[in-house]
Amino acid sequence: MVRLSYHELLILSNIDPLSTQIERLDSMAVGPQTYTLPRADSHCWLAVTGSQAAEMFSKVCGVDLRPHKFANNAVAQTSVAKASAIVVRHDLGTTHCFYVLTDVSAAEFLWDCLIDAMLEYDGGPVGVASMRELAAEG
């Protein structure tokens, strides 16, 4: 769960494909001034991991994401490669991990920008299976 503002929370499911976490939350009773706003159809969710992830972001994001400046579970609503984005640091065990959420219409553009930035650090896409392995280690 990430606090975006005083009255707004963002709840991300875990990376387990069989998780029913979000469905359980959707079925819970909520207060009169509370409502859910599903973002699965409007947002993409990317993850950048690794010891040089924060340095890589310095090429495409104005927020200082280095570990001593941007704590685990911190959130920033900012722009990444000129696309509006939410960046959440959510380490997987001892591996630095940054979740990037942006409008689905910017997904391909942002993906290309992140891949380009990763190349300088010998990084590249790894897929969800690798993310699950990192989460299991933590």
Features from the language model and the residues they span:
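Basic, glycine/lysine-rich polyanion-binding surfaces/domains
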Residues: M1-G138
